[in-house]
């Protein structure tokens, strides 16, 4: 085991559901996990709602926005964290043409991007 202790996670516009039957899940799994991944012991961890996986997570801070094409992934994962009674916080920015997928990474000089970093740091300080 690693000596690295993770106190909290900050997840920006996450691609949590890589094997859903959607535009991403139709082609991505075989590239990420290999053609026969469903036959491996790793397969159960591809589902981010796997209870074992959820229970092993440090507190989670999530951010998305109305115009994020992966917003549903983030809000669904937040619901899974809620059902598993895991410590987490979700920030969901309202509709704005500049606040697209991972805006805080791709557009770091937006005021909202600075706010994302500030909020994430504040969350981390709790732990």
Regions found by a protein language model. Give the residues of each.
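Alpha/beta-hydrolase superfamily serine-hydrolase fold, recognizing
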Residues: 1-127
